[in-house]
């Protein structure tokens, strides 16, 4: 998940058994509004179609240091992204998702039985970077089709998270911003036909809640037009390249884009090989945003698109 700046102003259906909702949700979209003068408590009764939170192992560990956020996450549909070789965090119920930036790496891990016990889903994350082969960058739909076949053959669900920077390879001559090229190329629709979950890497737009929401709404509508059963998530970053963002900007992006999506991939990146232009990690930004969403709540979106394998999440402690 990268965060290159390319916003309008500038610039990973679950199988029936996996769709049953067993994790009550608390974080976003389902907290009832507290009476005036009262703060919503951690004991609020919550409907079953709240926002899903897709989080890396590191992000989940950092966010869980805050008691309010930890309590919310414990009653929310949470998907924990692991890299090959990692083990899930102890003491937190989450559905295990293992991430791969390349189909060959996924195929090798499956053939070698190297996925952690309890893995329920695969995240395929194609981007224009050294981790995704050039052939997959040139045809991410074909690569995602192969990833889906591999995942489904092993009883796993698939999340695909195509980066906006793929458009620099797919439509190199266009002067339109990347988000517009992504829509024009119908990438959301084409990948939605293949995958169980589509993650829209919209984090580069989060500094403007209007720009973020406009792209997310249009891409989500495009995806559901192609596959009404697809689950759609949207990306957020507490630390994208460029000017620093704050918690309010993330909260505003969530409030502006919900209920167009079913949840969010909230990333807390630090500078490293997968994000060489990221600023130093700022987990407090993500914590602040989630605290605000817990306290404010979000309206029910009326859809019944549970998180990947969410009924299984309650059984891992």
State each model region's role.
Residues 40-317:
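Glycan-processing catalytic domains of CAZymes
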Residues 2, 19-20, 32:
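Position-driven detector of the extreme protein N-terminus
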Residues 27-45:
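C-terminal region of N-terminal signal peptides and the immediate post-cleavage residues
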Residues 5-6, 33, 44, 313:
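Intrinsically disordered, low-complexity serine/threonine-rich segments
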Residues 17-28:
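Bacterial N-terminal signal peptides
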Residues 4-18:
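Bacterial N-terminal signal peptides that target proteins for export
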């Amino acid at each position: 998940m990268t965060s290159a700046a390319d916003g309008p102003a500038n610039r990973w259906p679950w199988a029936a058994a996996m769709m049953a909702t067993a994790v009550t949700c608390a974080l976003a979209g389902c907290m009832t509004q507290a009476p005036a003068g009262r703060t919503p408590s951690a004991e609020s009764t919550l409907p079953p179609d709240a926002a899903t939170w897709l989080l890396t192992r590191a992000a989940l560990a950092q966010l869980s240091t805050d008691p309010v956020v930890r309590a919310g996450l414990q009653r929310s549909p949470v998907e924990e992204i692991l890299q090959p070789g990692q083990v899930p965090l102890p003491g937190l119920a989450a559905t295990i998702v293992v991430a791969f930036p390349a189909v060959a790496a996924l195929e090798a891990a499956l053939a070698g039985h190297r996925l952690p016990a309890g893995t329920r889903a695969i995240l395929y994350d194609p981007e224009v970077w050294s981790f995704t082969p050039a052939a997959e960058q040139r045809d991410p739909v074909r690569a995602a089709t192969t990833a889906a076949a591999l995942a489904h053959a092993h009883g796993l669900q698939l999340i695909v998270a195509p980066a906006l920077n793929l458009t620099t390879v797919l439509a190199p001559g266009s002067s339109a911003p990347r988000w517009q090229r992504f829509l024009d190329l119908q990438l959301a629709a084409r990948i939605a036909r293949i995958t169980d979950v589509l993650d829209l890497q919209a984090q580069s737009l989060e500094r403007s809640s209007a720009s973020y929401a406009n792209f997310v709404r249009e891409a989500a509508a495009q995806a559901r037009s192609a596959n009404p059963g697809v689950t759609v998530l949207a990306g957020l970053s507490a630390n994208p390249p460029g000017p620093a963002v704050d918690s309010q900007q993330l909260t505003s992006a969530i409030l502006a884009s919900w209920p167009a999506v079913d949840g969010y991939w909230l990333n807390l990146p630090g500078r490293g090989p997968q994000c060489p232009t990221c600023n130093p990690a700022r987990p407090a930004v993500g914590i602040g945003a989630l605290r605000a969403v817990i306290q404010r709540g979000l309206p029910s979106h009326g859809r019944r698109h549970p998180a990947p394998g969410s009924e299984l999440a309650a059984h891992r402690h």
